[in-house]
A protein has these predicted regions:
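Short secondary-structure boundary/capping segments
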Residues: 26, 150-155, 244-250, 414-424, ...
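Acidic, Mg2+-coordinating catalytic module of metal-dependent nucleases/exonucleases
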Residues: 196-203, 209, 228-233, 242-250, ...
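Charged, glycine/proline-rich intrinsically disordered loops and linkers
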Residues: 37-61, 150-195, 251-268, 521-535
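Conserved DEDDh/DEDDy metal-dependent 3′-5′ exonuclease domain
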Residues: 102-109, 122-127, 135-140, 191-194, ...
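Conserved RNase H-like, two-metal-ion catalytic cores of nucleic-acid enzymes
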Residues: 83, 87-91, 135-137, 149-165, ...
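Metal-dependent nuclease catalytic cores that hydrolyze phosphodiester bonds in DNA/RNA
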Residues: 1-135, 141-175, 324-329, 333-381
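Two-metal-ion RNase H-like nuclease active-site motif
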Residues: 103-111, 398-408, 509
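Flexible loop/turn segments at secondary-structure boundaries
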Residues: 17-18, 26-29, 142-145, 237-239, ...
């Protein structure tokens, strides 16, 4: 085996990780087979892709990292497209010899041995000319983090860019002769690049590890050429114009924007080297002196993230699946709990695992947390009948229960889309004509794209055909998502703009009924304090109002017997259309229809359950 870039990232999480791996020391300096590396690298790339695609999903329990090889390969083709576009741009920027390939067999590799341990990495794009070597690391994230996420200024109105576009490459620009306050603000943002567990810093850390391996390899071979390090990511400002050659999409430069953006990380990765060297010392000590005894958990665990530590179940064995100390309504690491503002890792490290492990005095001045705790301790239901009734009175019938399924493809597929646009391929609609009057089958319509081609216009036509924009209420769980999709479609198909905007404007959210919406309830005449309170709570919600949690509390309806159980499984199924046999495709479409129909029917059922609850509550 060898310590690859991915191994390095994992083995330096904490002291315990390498001990749990039970590494064989006699294999530490051996060559890793290309097959072993490819398998490991593909998993890492897939994980990165998932992080970017599903960063806004509510399907926190969906584990797509365990999909079959067929599913993994189908999704990975989008990652390979990003690599290919990055290679095209590299050839426009640099001269000399290029080495890149969709197949890791043909990629440039670097390795060296240190204290009996071999370190190894492959390079996505390698460029060499007479003067220098250029290393381009390709990531499927977008430029938004490095452009929008790193803006700084002396006040909220002043926005300076940390990276400035020069000759096709974004380059670091530190403030010169700026005020002390400006320099302080710059440094605060600059530190984010060195936070290996943040969305901004993780890819920089990845490239810094590569630099460490590459420089030691070159040093061992006495190669003294200058080496430049670049990060290539998708350009969040790029809007695809729909141009195709035959059946192939061509991502042309549009208004000066390329589909990928290059960031010069030379200075930053150089500054990282002492940090990496220190981590190497720690890693080697942990390997040669393994200690699997418990250690503190922390941000390095990446708990509940796509990149979470694979030994999470060992270190978090005492944390209950439901009603843990993490599950208090409104609890975030930024807000914290208790006098010391404990984040979730502090809670675990100090022995607070369950909901009732938290001292009740920590919940004072946190009324929703107190409601949750009271329901948990006393096995009771909390219900604000008046607020829910007032919300029902705002509804205008018919109610159009609407749910979209979308595919946030890394590479924009259709005209008007950007990288990771939530491209809709399906919707379900249940029409509730009067309170409780809605037939599961007769009052339902499902539109599903028949192919992977652009069928958005057909979808829009069905929406405006079945939803009257002049009356009724569009209803959704997390209505912001449905509103945003309707408005995006309106701009792409301006002939339907008025109708789609009117539908979006006449909308409300299931969460306003079951949870709250402070501004709406204040408009309805409730005081500020009461408007902030949740309307309903049952201990089985475990602090969450997702439809998957509320449904079993208020009905017998379940997703467990469905082939497609959540939105992420839905989009993966859709993305596999072209890889299926006719029989598989027919079954997949049936499963997608059943799942999407279940989502809107669930809203009908939950709303009716609430209606009956307030009607029967004394």
């Amino acid at each position: 085996m060898a310590i690859t870039k991915t191994n390095f990232i994992d083995y330096t999480r904490c002291r315990r990780y390498s001990a749990l791996e039970n590494i064989r020391k006699d294999k530490l300096d051996s060559k890793m087979t290309i097959e072993e590396y490819m398998k490991e690298n593909e998993k890492e790339e897939y994980r990165e892709l998932l992080e970017s695609m599903f960063e806004s999903t509510d399907d926190k329990d969906a584990d797509l990292t365990k999909k079959e090889d067929k599913e993994l390969s189908a999704m990975m083709k989008y990652y390979k497209e990003v690599e290919l576009e990055s290679a095209f741009k590299s050839k426009r920027l640099f001269n000399g010899k290029f080495v890149y390939s969709e197949n890791t067999y043909n990629q440039e590799s670097f390795d060296f041995v240190h204290n009996g341990i071999r370190y190894l990495c492959y390079v996505d794009i390698y460029n060499e000319n007479d003067d220098e070597i250029n290393i381009i690391e390709v990531k499927s994230t977008t430029s938004r983090n490095y452009i929008e996420g790193l803006k700084y200024g002396e006040n909220s109105k002043e926005k300076n860019d940390m990276f400035i576009l020069e000759d096709g490459i974004y380059k670091l620009k530190k403030p010169v002769n700026g005020s002390d306050k400006l320099i302080k603000k710059f440094n605060e943002k600059y530190k984010k690049l060195f936070d290996r567990y943040s969305d901004i810093g993780r890819y920089v850390f990845d490239l810094a590890v590569q630099r460490y391996i590459i420089e030691n390899d070159l040093k061992s071979h006495k190669i003294n050429k200058r080496v430049n390090y670049y990060l290539s990511v998708l350009n969040h400002n790029y809007v695809y114009d729909g141009y195709m050659v035959g059946e192939k999409r061509v991502y042309r430069t549009i208004n000066g924007e390329d589909i990928v953006s290059f960031f010069d990380m030379n200075e930053i990765t150089k500054e990282y080297m002492p940090i990496i060297e220190s981590l190497v010392d720690t890693l080697e000590n942990n390997i040669y002196n393994p200690d699997s005894s418990p250690c503190n958990v922390g941000v390095h665990c990446s708990y509940k993230e796509k990149c979470e530590c694979k030994y999470k179940n060992i270190c978090y064995k005492d944390l209950p699946e439901y009603n843990s100390s993490f599950n208090y309504i409104g609890f975030t690491d930024r807000i914290g709990l208790g006098p010391d503002k404990y984040n979730k890792y502090d809670l675990i490290n100090n022995g607070y695992y369950k909901l009732d492990d938290i001292p009740i005095e920590w919940l004072q001045n946190k009324p929703n947390m107190l409601i949750e705790r009271e329901c948990y301790d006393n096995d009771k239901i909390y219900l604000d009948k008046e607020k829910i009734i007032a919300m029902f009175d705002t509804l205008e019938y018919p109610i159009y229960h609407l749910d979209f399924e979308s595919f946030p493809c890394p590479m924009p597929r259709f005209k008007g889309e950007r990288p990771y646009t939530q491209s809709c391929f399906e919707f379900s609609l249940h029409i509730e004509h009067e309170p409780g009057i809605c037939d599961k089958d007769k009052d339902n319509y499902v539109f599903l794209a028949d192919t992977l081609n652009d069928e958005r216009l057909e979808m829009v036509k069905e929406i405006v055909k079945r939803i009257d924009p002049s009356k009724g209420t569009m209803f959704a769980q997390n209505v912001t998502f449905e509103r945003s999709r309707l408005k995006e479609l309106a701009y792409i198909f301006p002939e339907y703009k008025d109708q789609l905007f009117k539908i979006a404007e006449r909308s409300t959210d299931l969460l306003y009924f079951i949870k709250n919406n402070q501004s709406i309830y204040e408009e309805l005449g409730f005081d500020e304090e009461r408007s902030k309170l949740v309307n309903f709570y049952h201990k089985n919600l475990s602090g969450s109002y997702s439809i998957k949690k509320t449904l079993p509390v208020l009905s017998d309806l379940t997703y467990k017997n469905l082939e497609v159980k959540n939105g992420t499984e839905a989009l993966v199924t859709y993305s596999l259309y072209d890889d299926m046999t006719p029989d598989e495709l027919e079954r997949a479409k049936k499963n997608l229809r059943v799942y999407c129909k279940q989502d809107t029917w669930a809203m009908v059922v939950i709303l009716d359950a609430l209606r009956n609850l307030v009607k029967n509550d004394k």
